[in-house]
Design a protein with these regions (language model features):
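Hydrophobic h-region of N-terminal signal peptides that target proteins for export
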Residues: 4-17
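Domain-level detector of nuclease and nuclease-like folds
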Residues: 64-211
């Protein structure tokens, strides 16, 4: 099936993959695809993100028995290990921060995306988390592009929902190409049409009861 993304003016063959397992690390959940050997998306809650933890000694690892794209594929591939649950969001706690350095929490991103508009939006959303608790869901869309043995997402996306109002505040779509890393705001309906599945935003507020 083809879907024309009018905001970018491109027609591409969008591929469907299934989420096969959920890797729960407490601070985030990775919805992992065996066929991709990558996460389809990652979900986490952010409240007052940021901090002073030094990440200079942290390295990406695979601490599961699952086969996944890892250091052997990334080395000299030209792609960054693009965090989905952002490391700096958890820099208030080095133990939590280190947990973001997992291969089931990253996608191959071009350097100009990972260090450009992706990073800019990570900073913007972290600033917004100082005033509101946010649900962040972020992942990729694949069209069959294979670079040096890695299935590379053609797009990366990010959805942000306010947990105080349940309003979806951002739906972001980024092209993941060497010379093109445009970020666009689109609608949730447009994104879900591309994904072929519903983004798992929260439908009801969680009411905390006193013990």
């Amino acid at each position: 099936m083809k879907f024309m993304l009018l905001t970018l003016g491109i027609v591409l063959q969008l591929l469907s993959f299934s989420q096969d397992t959920i890797i729960d690390r407490g601070i985030y959940q990775s919805y992992y695809s065996y066929s991709l050997q990558q996460p389809m998306y990652v979900k986490y809650v952010l409240w007052k993100g940021g901090g002073e933890c030094s990440r200079s000694k942290f390295r990406f690892i695979n601490d599961t028995e699952l086969a996944m794209v890892d250091n052997s594929e990334y080395t000299r591939s030209g792609f960054d290990r693009g965090h989905l649950a952002n490391a700096e969001d958890f820099a208030y706690d080095c133990v939590k921060d280190e947990l973001t350095f997992r291969y089931y929490n990253c996608l191959p991103q071009t350097p100009n995306l990972n260090r450009g508009p992706w990073k800019v939006w990570e900073t913007t959303i972290r600033q917004e988390s100082q005033k509101d608790s946010l649900l962040i869901i972020t992942g990729g869309i694949w069209t069959g592009t294979v670079e040096k043995g890695i299935q590379v997402p053609t797009y990366c996306w990010k959805v942000v929902q306010s947990l105080s109002t349940l309003k979806v505040t951002h739906v972001l779509l980024f092209t993941n190409k060497i010379n093109d890393s445009v970020g666009k705001e689109i609608t949730l309906a447009e994104l879900e049409k591309m994904l072929k599945y519903q983004v798992p935003i929260r439908k009801k507020k969680i009411i905390k009861t006193k013990k």
